[in-house]
Amino acid sequence: MKKIAVLISGQGTNLQTIIDACHSGDIPAKIACVISNKADAYGLVRAKQAQIPQAVFLRKNFSNNLEMDDAIGDYLQSLAVDLIVLAGYMKILTPKFTQRFAGKILNIHPSLLPKYAGLNTYQRAIEAGDNEHGTTVHFVNEEVDGGAIVLQAKVPIFPEDSIEEVEARTREQEYQIYPLVIKWFTEGRLRLKDNLAYLDGKALPKSGYANE
C-alpha cells in the first residue's frame, strides 16, 4: 500500500477529506504522517484523532529555509513516502526540496491556474469582476503554483457574493477533486513526466483533465 505524507499549516479541512477517503478505501493508501509548520494547527488534532503520526517543524528552530526543508525531506525519506500532499501548507518549498521529490508532490490552489497564483485569490477574482472562480490540483515544481495542472473545478461568482461565499463554494469542490487526484496517483494512474501530467498513459492538456 502506498504511503502519503500530508503537510498542513492550519485547520486541516482538506486533510480531513483525505483521512476519510483513506479510511473508506476510496484512496488505496495509508497516511504515514501529518507535518505542520505551525504548532497550534488544528489539523494536528485531526491527525491525532485518526491515530496518524504528527510532526512539527518550526522555522525558528532552523537557521534558514533550506535547512528546514532538508530536515523535513530527511524525515519523509525515512518513512519512504510515495506521495507528499500539500493541504493548506502556507510556506513556499525550496527548489532543492521540490527537485528532491519531483513528481511526488501535489498541491491544491484556490483559483483556476494560471490565473491568480499566490494569495487572496477570492478577493482578486471578485475585484476583477469575474463571473467564475475555481480550484486547481497540480504537481509542485520550483515555480510557485506553476507545476503541471492535473484537474480543475469551476464555481460561479454571483454579483452580490462575498469573499466568504465564493470561498465556501470553492472549498466544496476542493473536497471532491483532491481525494480523486490522490486516488489516481496512488493507483498508479497519474504521473509526471517532462513537467507534463499523464493520466492512464495519456498526456493531459495544460488546463488539466477537467477541461480536456
UniProtKB/Swiss-Prot annotation:
It is an enzyme of class 2 (transferase). GO terms for cellular component: cytoplasm; cytosol. One of its GO terms (molecular function) is phosphoribosylglycinamide formyltransferase activity. It comes from the Bacteria. The keyword Ribonucleoprotein does not apply. The record marks D145 as: Raises pKa of active site His. InterPro entries: Formyl_transf_N, Formyl_transf_N_sf, GART, GART_AS. SUPFAM superfamilies: Formyltransferase. The active site is at H109 (proton donor). (6R)-10-formyltetrahydrofolate binds at M90, K91, I92, L93, N107. It catalyses: N(1)-(5-phospho-beta-D-ribosyl)glycinamide + (6R)-10-formyltetrahydrofolate = N(2)-formyl-N(1)-(5-phospho-beta-D-ribosyl)glycinamide + (6S)-5,6,7,8-tetrahydrofolate + H(+). Signal peptide: none annotated. PROSITE patterns: GART. Pathway: Purine metabolism; IMP biosynthesis via de novo pathway; N(2)-formyl-N(1)-(5-phospho-D-ribosyl)glycinamide from N(1)-(5-phospho-D-ribosyl)glycinamide (10-formyl THF route): step 1/1. Pfam families: Formyl_trans_N (PF00551). One of its GO terms (biological process) is 'de novo' IMP biosynthetic process. Keywords: Purine biosynthesis, Transferase. Its EC number is 2.1.2.2. Catalyzes the transfer of a formyl group from 10-formyltetrahydrofolate to 5-phospho-ribosyl-glycinamide (GAR), producing 5-phospho-ribosyl-N-formylglycinamide (FGAR) and tetrahydrofolate. This is Phosphoribosylglycinamide formyltransferase. The gene is purN.
